């Protein structure tokens, strides 16, 4: 079988995708052939990597960034503006831990504002509502109640992978951190992270034609569930399903399962990524913030973006 597989790949165009290469391998297999510890897809990805068309983690010169503390919408804008900087070569690929100074709800790119948001709760608590560039569900975020990070990378790192494969691949380092913290976590397809005690968080992605992407994750640290249910419509629906409004007062998987302050968990994330990928420590500059504020004015804060019909 190995001889046939090798022959099937010889003469293939260098521009062949991992999927196309996998199809060649599949076609070369005879009935009864068994590949031990490898799949046709894995062979395709390996060939692409050997050609320099697909990347490994070790190929990327990363930065790791914490913060800064910014107005709620700035983080959302930077998920777009900083990707542009990386694609233009002005910044290295990076992992950035978010910090924010006010309450916010961040809805997914394809969600309906009206279907997700209870306007009365938003006004009552002075909450900023933002629409991010990635898909996924609504995130209720007050200062200190969540752990959120953005990973900006070349899409070549997940060349040939399906979305279902890419999510756990990009968050394998997170699973290692959670294990160190005493949480036995796993990925629940497509994009949820859960432990034996239930869901911890979720991930979302956006890929650009520039060849770069943002992958971000939000994990609940200690959320006021009562307030969340007054702000998010889906929260009200879940409470009604349970038949009670007082059943759950807090959603706190990261706090209750680790027993650690949020700051220690963030430091564990920061240190593990830095050490695992030999990342240098990066910063967000005043120019980065200026560009993000401008993008808020021209896009992210505008009603036609926040309230757009997907």
Predicted regions and their residues:
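Residues that cap or initiate secondary-structure elements
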Residues: 13, 70, 103, 113, ...
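Active-site-adjacent structural elements in enzyme catalytic domains
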Residues: 127
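Catalytic beta-strand/loop module used to bind and position nucleotide/cofactor moieties
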Residues: 1-2, 7, 110, 118-119, ...
